[in-house]
């Protein structure tokens, strides 16, 4: 599969953009486990054109993450075009690698974004959505992609027709999450309409399916049943970035990968922590790692007290000591028989 000139190989598995999750350290971790392409957190168009430091910082990437997409969102057409131009030149503005793809967020359902007419709020204004997309495609050099949903609600699932219109603007790929905005993340994702987009003989750009890919078998089923060109993994990667390895292993061999041992998880947590503190400093790096540390050891028996200590430890040294303790106490946990299979 290609996005523009970017060859992602056969059946690529992508990391979805997620606010407060897909920062640089997590993106590097997911790449290490086999993600074929990763995306930044959501970058607000109004923040970029105001020269807001936080928005600009979200565009800083590294060669270790490539290929990478910068995802922008907003409702104002002029601001979105200007933000796209800035993303197009992110290497000069924010430093680092820059971006390989500019992705437009027409899918986020949270109220603070959709309620302002951005993200999946744009599903109520498909003409404006198409106009913004076309204007961005014409304004930048990098390939442009779109991520969106089935529609605003159950009565307005417009994605099959809208996919054609978006393709006609010149985008190079389309990602569709199998829920409406009003569903948020409730219930199960419905991939039926994603499959119908692929069945449309007029569609020629890659279609990337998203929604509830929380196991290697579900990933395989998505490719087999709905014929998508690629899948995008979101929430299931949080606390479980090795899901990319698990998916690739099933796709390539037909067999389940060996489980991630406690010792491997400890090694991963230490590496991830070192990345986070190196990129964000010892204070912020530890604070923002806590959400990941809390999830890396799900399923361990009698772990509650240690989890509390893990997410409140104020220094990297104390976190490291707790991780060593986890390895000593739970390293032979029968839920995780194997060790060091991931080469960490």
Where are these regions (language model features)?
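Glycine-rich, positively charged N-terminal anion/phosphate-binding segment
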Residues: 1-4, 9, 18-94
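Active-site beta-loop-alpha junctions enriched in small/polar residues
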Residues: 18-20, 43-45, 73-75, 107-109, ...
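Hydrophobic faces of well-ordered beta-strands that scaffold small-molecule active sites
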Residues: 13-16, 38-40, 68-72, 102-104, ...
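Functionally engaged cysteine thiol sites
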Residues: 30, 108, 341
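Methionine-biased hydrophobic packing positions in alpha-helices, especially
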Residues: 18, 80, 106, 122-123, ...
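Alpha/beta enzyme core
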Residues: 81-118, 126-205
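Alpha/beta catalytic cores of nucleotide-metabolism and tRNA/nucleoside-modifying enzymes
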Residues: 1-4, 9, 19, 24-25, ...
């Amino acid at each position: 599969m290609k996005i523009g000139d970017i060859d992602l190989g056969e059946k690529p598995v992508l990391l979805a953009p997620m606010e407060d999750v897909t920062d640089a350290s997590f993106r590097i971790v997911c790449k290490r486990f086999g993600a074929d392409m990763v995306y930044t957190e959501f970058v607000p168009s109004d923040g970029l054109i105001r020269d807001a430091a936080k928005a600009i910082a979200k565009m800083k990437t590294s060669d270790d993450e490539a290929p990478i997409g910068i995802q922008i969102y907003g409702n104002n057409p002029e601001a979105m075009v200007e933000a796209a131009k800035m993303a197009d030149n992110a290497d000069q503005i924010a430093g680092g690698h820059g971006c390989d793809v500019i992705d437009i967020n027409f899918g986020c359902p949270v109220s603070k974004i959709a309620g302002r007419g951005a993200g999946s709020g744009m599903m109520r204004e498909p003409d404006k959505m198409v106009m913004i997309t076309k204007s961005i495609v014409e304004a930048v050099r990098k390939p442009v992609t779109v991520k969106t949903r089935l529609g605003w609600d159950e009565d307005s699932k417009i994605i099959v027709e809208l996919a054609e219109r978006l393709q006609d603007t010149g985008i190079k790929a389309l990602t569709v999450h199998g829920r409406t905005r009003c569903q948020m993340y409730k219930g199960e994702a419905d991939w039926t309409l994603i499959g119908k987009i692929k069945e449309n003989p007029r569609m020629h750009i890659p279609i990337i399916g998203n929604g509830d890919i929380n196991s290697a078998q579900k990933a395989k089923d998505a490719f087999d049943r709905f014929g998508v060109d690629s899948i995008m993994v979101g929430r299931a990667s949080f606390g479980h970035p090795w899901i990319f390895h698990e998916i690739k292993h099933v796709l390539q061999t037909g067999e389940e990968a060996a489980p991630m041992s406690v010792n491997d998880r400890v090694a991963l947590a230490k590496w991830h922590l070192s990345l986070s503190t190196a990129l964000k400093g010892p204070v912020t790096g530890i604070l923002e790692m806590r959400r990941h540390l809390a999830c890396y050891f799900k399923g361990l028996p009698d772990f509650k007290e240690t989890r509390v200590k893990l997410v409140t430890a104020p220094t990297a040294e104390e976190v490291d000591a707790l991780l060593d303790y986890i390895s000593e106490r739970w390293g032979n946990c029968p839920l995780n028989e194997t060790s060091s299979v991931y080469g960490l």
